Curated annotation (Swiss-Prot):
Part of the 50S ribosomal subunit. GO terms for biological process: negative regulation of translation; translation. It comes from Synechococcus sp. (strain CC9902). Disulfide bonds: none annotated. This is Large ribosomal subunit protein uL13. Residues 136-150 have a biased composition (Polar residues).
Length: 150
């Protein structure tokens, strides 16, 4: 009978990675980042523990989508009040708050429970190349070549 080894929470060594979103396809970038946030790249991955690493995404305003999605993909939010639904296209949201596009795509690929919320807190998304996490010495993360937009 095999026994599952549980890594102690203190022994989990979290790495910091920086990902450049320039000319990356939104969904392909989001799946790779979500996998790292979950910890699936670590040998001590455990589904019910947060074993993931920190990820800093830069150049969020340069993310790409294919086809007519810039004009047709819609982002909805609701104020909680009657008639408070706001709908915005990818293009207009990318002009206003490009970080939200990447955050929303990655958050949707994480578990929808308390553990997923804990994993989501390790994601940092910034417009432009500057970020305040240089003290953590994040390693540049090269995504799969197939994840690059053509």
């Amino acid at each position: 009978m095999n026994k599952t080894s549980l890594p102690p929470i203190d022994s989990i060594d979290r790495q910091w990675y920086v990902v450049d979103a320039e000319n990356q396809t939104l969904g392909r970038l989001a799946t790779e980042v979500a996998s790292i946030l979950r910890g699936k790249n670590n040998p001590n991955f455990t589904p019910h523990l947060d074993t993931g690493d920190f990820v800093v995404v830069v150049n969020a305003e340069k993310i790409q989508v294919s086809g007519k999605k810039p004009q047709q993909k819609l982002y909805r939010r609701h104020s909680g009040r009657p008639g408070g639904m706001k709908v915005e296209t990818f293009e207009s949201l990318q002009e206003r708050i490009p970080e939200r596009i990447v955050e929303k795509a990655i958050k949707g690929m994480l578990p929808h429970n308390a553990l997923g919320r804990q994993m989501y807190r390790k994601l940092k998304v910034y417009k432009g190349t500057e970020h305040p996490h240089s003290a953590q010495k994040p390693q540049p993360l090269q995504l799969n070549p197939s994840a690059t937009a053509k």
